[in-house]
Every structure is written in structure tokens, then in C-alpha cells.
Amino acid sequence: MKTIFALVFCCAIAVVVLGFGENEGSTIDHDQNNCKGPGSRCSNKNECCKPKDMETYTYYCGSRWDSSSGDFVRKCVICNRESSMC
């Protein structure tokens, strides 16, 4: 019982210290426009924040696997142009 209590207590402390995750709200990109950060759900590219270095990085709204819903969802992505994963 003490072990379970200690585990729950440590998890609670971790949540307080680290905070909760982003709620997919909008952020402000370097051009002072409201946009959605990487990993946020989107319906088109225009909703996503642009990378600061557009020569090295690109961005798009693409399908990604969402383990919580068990399905593919469209999310904002920023990746290196030279990467094979982009």
C-alpha cells in the first residue's frame, strides 16, 4: 500500500513540476500571426506556424498516427528539407 501511495504521490509531484501539455491552442509565429504549433491538429497548411529558417526547414499539415484515438489525424509538422522523413 505504501508503494502505491508513493508512486501516486511522485506522479502528482511530476505533474505539478512539469505542468500539463499544450491543449492544441494557437500560438504566435515570428510574423505575429496566430498559428498552431507542431503536433497540433490542423485542416490545412495555413493554420500551422512557419519555421523561422525557411531555407533549412519546411512545414505542412499532414496525416499522423494518433495513438490516443487509434486513427490517423492531420497535424502540423516542421521538418528539415534534407530529411528523408519529410
UniProtKB/Swiss-Prot annotation:
Q: What is this protein called?
A: Toxin ICK-18
Supply the source organism for this entry. Trittame loki (Brush-footed trapdoor spider)
Task: List the InterPro entries hit by this protein, alphabetically.
Answer: Cys_Knot_tox
Q: In which tissues is it expressed?
A: Expressed by the venom gland.
Q: Which protein family is it in?
A: Belongs to the neurotoxin 21 family.
Pfam families, sorted: Cys_Knot_tox
| Localisation per UniProt entry | Secreted
Q: Which GO terms describe its cellular component?
A: extracellular region
Give each disulfide bond as a residue pair.
C35-C49, C42-C61, C48-C76, C79-C86
